[in-house]
Amino acid sequence: MEISWGRALWRNFLGQSPDWYKLALIIFLIVNPLIFLISPFVAGWLLVAEFIFTLAMALKCYPLLPGGLLAIEAVFIGMTSAEHVREEVAANLEVLLLLMFMVAGIYFMKQLLLFIFTRLLLSIRSKMLLSLSFCVAAAFLSAFLDALTVVAVVISVAVGFYGIYHRVASSRTEDTDLQDDSHIDKHYKVVLEQFRGFLRSLMMHAGVGTALGGVMTMVGEPQNLIIAKAAGWHFGDFFLRMSPVTVPVLICGLLTCLLVEKLRWFGYGETLPEKVREVLQQFDDQSRHQRTRQDKIRLIVQAIIGVWLVTALALHLAEVGLIGLSVIILATSLTGVTDEHAIGKAFTESLPFTALLTVFFSVVAVIIDQQLFSPIIQFVLQASEHAQLSLFYIFNGLLSSISDNVFVGTIYINEAKAAMESGAITLKQYELQAVAINTGTNLPSVATPNGQAAFLFLLTSALAPLIRLSYGRMVWMALPYTLVLTLVGLLCVEFTLAPVTEWFMQMGWIATL
């Protein structure tokens, strides 16, 4: 018997999402306009909370759908305007270009990356040393590449590893649905679960590594570039200005990596199962024997393109997204990928997230129009000069954990610059505030996927459900890093930032503009 029209509509609405989730979203959509009529400020914060809820439930339903419905309603009822949303999208065009082209560009370097990381994984047997290697590699790469690019690299490698073993475990040679475990017997499932734990820990170490390295340079994160421009700093200036905070944080972050692996805390410490190592070793040996001269040329070309990528980003020869586009063009041209459908596959991972980030910019527009952060900014600027640095760091950290890093960093640096230009603070104080804002925006935000775009990208990627990496588990595994990075960063802002910066000036390494 065919179901009723109403039941059919209910089933189609948000598809396979749980009924309670669908009901919650409908309640949000009904309540928001009513509260907006009473208090736009409260309605604005409620919208932010609801959007965070959709992100937290990313595995129930991709946040683009519920978040998009909330954003459309916000524009319709007047919480912001379509014109302001367009302005926010235009202001963040380089971030969108990064997502569209750089992440897609990495897709065409997968062979090289899988080759390198397979060798790394098979040659280092110590889990502590392997975790440290992944963390250091991610930190180094994210000092030159955007964190999203680095995470995209590690995701592609992890999916490759998982796919190799899953095909063996399911006794199928052809491409199968990696989420389908129905053909895997109990013994293989136990090993597969251990392998998932191993990959989860590596992904989290690499993700935190991107935060450790990304905060250090002006090209490491999009907001770093905005802050560097506002302060008038170049690549070397930015690195030295940040180093009184970022170098101690990097050291403590790497020590935390070793500690959680050694003590098996917070879901870390899972080793690579020997059976999986054997499968990966066989795959590596087989790949080496089957590798033709044409395949070797592809690897060499991809390595050369990798050098171009790092060089172009370090020297900032063009916008990050345009450099990514050049990688796509060079990689496809020189490795023989000419079919439109083959090229199109490169964009399947990044475009849903690009759309989600565009929806988030509409929430950012609401935050600006309803002046949700104004009370916090006014409170900070009323404090003493010394207290301002710690307060900027703390409030940046709190807001960055629930909001967009680029937005938070931009808002605070603009407010600080306006205060400097009005004479409320000195140029020297403004430059110290810029460091506090940058480190406060980057370091505590590892607490949740909402704060780090790279973490959110990981959470909503095809890999997350494969290795059972949920929002809650990600927050739990990030907790030791959150505590260490936040507290060490705060202590450095409080005690070492001003004296070390003063010493750099006396040495002539940096100068106030």
Swiss-Prot record:
- Would you tell me the Gene Ontology cellular component terms? plasma membrane
Q: How does it sit in the membrane?
A: Multi-pass membrane protein
| Localization, UniProt | Cell inner membrane
Q: Which UniProt keywords are present, listed alphabetically?
A: Antiport, Cell inner membrane, Cell membrane, Ion transport, Membrane, Sodium, Sodium transport, Transmembrane, Transmembrane helix, Transport
- Which is an annotated GO molecular function term of this record? sodium:proton antiporter activity
**Which Pfam family, any one, appears in the UniProt record?**
NhaB
Q: What is its main location?
A: membrane
- Asked whether the UniProt record includes Ion transport among its keywords, one would answer yes
The record's listing under InterPro entries reads: Na+/H+_antiporter_NhaB (IPR004671)
- Catalysis: reaction(s): 2 Na(+)(in) + 3 H(+)(out) = 2 Na(+)(out) + 3 H(+)(in)
Residues passing through the membrane, by range: 23-43, 52-72, 97-117, 120-140, 144-164, 202-222, 238-258, 303-323, 348-368, 391-411, 447-467, 475-495
Q: Which domain of life is it from?
A: Bacteria
- Stored NCBIfam families: NhaB, PRK09547.1
The free-text function statement in the UniProt record for this protein reads: Na(+)/H(+) antiporter that extrudes sodium in exchange for external protons.
Q: Which HAMAP family match?
A: NhaB
Q: What is this protein called?
A: Na(+)/H(+) antiporter NhaB
**Organism field:** Escherichia coli (strain 55989 / EAEC)
What gene does this protein come from?
Answer: nhaB
